[in-house]
A protein has these predicted regions:
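Mobile, glycine-rich extracellular loop/lid and propeptide segments
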Residues: 110-119, 125-142, 159-165, 174-177, ...
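Acidic/hydrophobic-patterned starts of short beta strands in beta-sheet-rich repeat architectures
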Residues: 52-61, 122-131, 167-176, 253-262, ...
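Long, internal scaffold/assembly segments composed of regular secondary structure
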Residues: 242, 246, 251-317, 321-329
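A detector of repeated loop/turn-to-beta-strand junctions in beta-rich toroidal repeat architectures
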Residues: 71-75, 88, 127, 134-136, ...
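Short glycine/acidic-enriched loop and turn motifs that connect beta-strands
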Residues: 64-69, 134-135, 179-184, 264-268, ...
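Beta-propeller blade termini
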Residues: 40-55, 61, 112-120, 157-167, ...
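Blade-edge motifs of beta-propeller repeat domains
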Residues: 2-43, 80-110, 141-161, 195-241, ...
Length: 496
């Protein structure tokens, strides 16, 4: 079952997000507004709720931050949800210099570049796995008081992903070793599938090869799979990379989560790879954006047309600025069942221009509560009002027929109610995330500008409602507001 399928939706009274920012040009101060009385929160994914209070918690990566005098050592910031939304006072900052976290701050490690959420030990609290490069990943464990502890996953420091990959109802962990681009061919790196539950000492129920035997190969049988024969040259304990990030969902509706990864494909290009979940490891399948671009392209997974199969949404790349939606089915994804759109879609504005970055960031989830996942698109290269690369983001609603453009919304820093003032080079919309931080049953959007305030970075939050996103009581904050390292941190490089 996909992550979306784990949600139990209940209706409750909506409420303001209890935050407004007072700005003039840059981020300088923020003020809270009063919150109205509310009923109990709607149920949310355990993976998003670290303290079990019924509100999703936002994780923010600042991988370029200087920590303990180590440049680009990096950290993550966790801001906990509540009935009134996020508060900069209710937070946790985690780096390699944090007490209880294995290792020490290391220059260039970029701790927090990627991370994943999931209830690994089955206690009902979401846990957080932070990629730590060559130093391995670190697990922080959820509890009634929030994230605690720190368990090292040595040897697996790149783009971990949590999900129920074998369909047994328990959260598994796909782990990948750190690797770097070193030539034209993508290097292979160690990888493993840890079956859940996973204990707080870092011990899984079992360890499987990352790839099913049908994906192994050798020189026997005319270079075919060596699953039933000998002579394997490569088996299932490694996979090509480096892997930059990943997104989880169930594209074929078989009750087993799948992963879409952004990986190095060779000869200077990057692209998507789809791993189909199974009882004995992953198999590979077609996905849009396979090795087609040398530019970073956003990807999101969710059920846009509400048919029970998760769809894969891929942003525009260096060759075109079209967003592609590959609709899921019992047989998975196919080019024939893939549709595309650009900025001429009804409800969007602006001409299709090279460098806009339509879909550089993509998040897919249900904002208005109608049962269809909506598509949030970062457009960080958008030019307007004489400004270059000021940036914007759009929300394209889902429907029974998929995307139509009807009801689409576009926001930037000059939109009334959005804190701040648009400036050239802000690249507002560089990253996005959809999650219900105030528990009203509507996904709210977090959106970042990593270049705000001289590359310090900042994050905005707009509240979701039954009619889409609203700027009422919008919130914006930067690392200074969290008493976190700020200089050149690129706060908001990753959001989840």
């Amino acid at each position: 079952m996909s992550r979306a399928g784990h949600r139990i939706r209940t209706e409750r009274l909506g409420a303001p997000l209890a935050a407004a920012v007072l700005l003039a040009g840059g981020l300088s101060a923020w003020a809270l507004t009063g919150a109205s009385a509310q009923a109990a929160p709607a149920s949310v994914d355990a993976q998003d709720d670290f303290n079990g209070d019924g509100y999703a918690d936002l994780v923010i990566g600042a991988p370029n931050a200087t920590v303990s005098d180590k440049a680009k050592a990096g950290y993550v910031a966790i801001t906990y949800g509540s009935a009134s939304g996020l508060s900069t006072a209710n937070k946790k900052i985690v780096s390699r210099s944090t007490s209880g976290i294995p290792g020490s701050a290391t220059a260039g490690e970029r701790f927090g570049l990627t991370f994943t959420k999931g209830d690994l030990d089955g206690d009902g609290y979401g846990d957080l796995v932070i990629a730590g490069g060559p130093g391995g990943s670190v697990v922080l464990w959820g509890s009634a008081s929030g994230l605690t502890g720190g368990t090292n996953l040595a040897g697996y420091g790149q783009a971990p992903q949590a999900g129920d990959f074998d369909g047994d109802g328990k959260t598994d962990l796909a782990l990948f070793a750190h690797s770097t681009v070193a030539g034209d061919d993508p290097p292979s790196a160690k990888a493993a599938l840890w079956k859940g539950p996973i204990s707080r000492t870092g011990t899984p129920a079992a360890v499987l090869n990352i790839l099913d035997k049908s994906e192994w190969w050798g020189y026997d049988e005319d270079d075919a799979s060596c699953a039933t024969g000998g002579g394997c040259e490569e088996d299932g304990d490694s996979i090509s990379g480096p892997i930059v990030n990943g997104h989880v969902g169930d594209v074929n509706g078989d009750g087993k989560d799948d992963i879409v990864q952004w990986v190095y494909t060779g000869d200077g290009t990057w692209g998507n790879r789809l791993l189909i979940g199974g009882a004995s490891g992953f198999t590979k399948s077609w996905v849009p954006g396979e090795g087609a671009s040398s530019d970073v392209s956003g990807t999101g997974v969710g059920d846009v047309n509400g048919d029970g199969f998760d769809d894969v949404v891929v942003g525009g790349d260096g060759w075109d600025s079209k967003v592609r939606v590959a609709y899921g089915s019992a047989s998975g994804l196919s080019d024939a069942n893939t549709k595309s759109f650009d900025q001429s879609l009804p409800g969007l504005y602006g001409a299709e221009e090279e460098g806009d970055g339509l879909g550089t960031a993509i998040s897919v989830d249900d904002v208005n509560g109608d049962g269809y996942a909506d598509i949030a698109l970062g457009i960080p290269g958008e030019d307007f009002s004489g400004l270059t690369d000021a940036g914007s983001f759009a929300l394209v609603p889902g429907s029974a027929s998929g995307f139509t453009g009807t009801g689409s919304q576009v926001f930037h820093q000059n939109t009334p109610g959005v804190p701040g003032v648009a400036e050239s080079g802000d690249k507002f919309g560089a990253t996005t995330a959809l999650l219900d931080v105030n528990g009203d049953g509507h996904r709210d959007i977090a959106v970042a500008s990593t270049t705000e305030n001289g590359d310090n970075g900042a994050v905005w939050l707009l509240r979701g409602t039954s009619t889409g996103l609203t700027t009422d009581s919008a919130l914006a904050f930067g690392p200074d507001d969290l008493s976190a390292p700020a200089t050149k941190a690129q706060f908001g490089t990753s959001l989840r």
